[in-house]
C-alpha cells in the first residue's frame, strides 16, 4: 500500500490559477475531449499536492497534477478520490 507523501506546494495566485485552468482546458480539448468544462473547474490543493480539476455537466472530466518546480501539467489516469469533491 503506497504511503501518502506531502510535498511543499505554494498555492498559485488568482492569475496563475486562471492560466493553469486555461492550459488544462486546452490540453483536454486537444486530447479529443468532446464535453466542455464548466466554470466549476479550478485549482484544488489535496494533501500538499496541487491539482486542476475539470468538471463537466456529468461529473469530473479530467484531473491534472501540477508540478511544483515548473508548473507543468500532467493528466492523471487515476486520481485521488478526495480531489473530486
Name these PLM-found stretches.
Residues 32-68, 72:
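Exposed beta-strand-loop-beta-strand "reactive/processing" segments of non-cytosolic proteins
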Residues 2-38:
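Short, non-transmembrane alpha-helical segments in secretory-pathway proteins
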Residues 6, 11, 44-47, 77, ...:
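Context-gated lysine
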Amino acid at each position: 500500500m503506497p504511503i501518502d507523501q506531502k510535498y511543499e506546494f505554494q498555492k498559485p495566485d488568482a492569475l496563475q490559477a486562471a492560466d493553469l485552468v486555461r492550459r488544462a482546458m486546452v490540453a483536454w480539448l486537444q486530447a479529443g475531449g468532446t464535453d466542455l468544462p464548466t466554470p466549476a473547474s479550478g485549482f484544488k490543493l489535496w494533501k500538499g499536492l496541487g491539482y486542476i480539476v475539470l468538471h463537466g455537466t456529468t461529473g469530473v472530466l479530467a484531473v491534472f497534477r501540477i508540478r511544483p518546480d515548473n508548473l507543468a501539467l500532467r493528466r492523471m489516469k487515476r486520481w485521488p478520490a478526495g480531489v473530486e469533491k
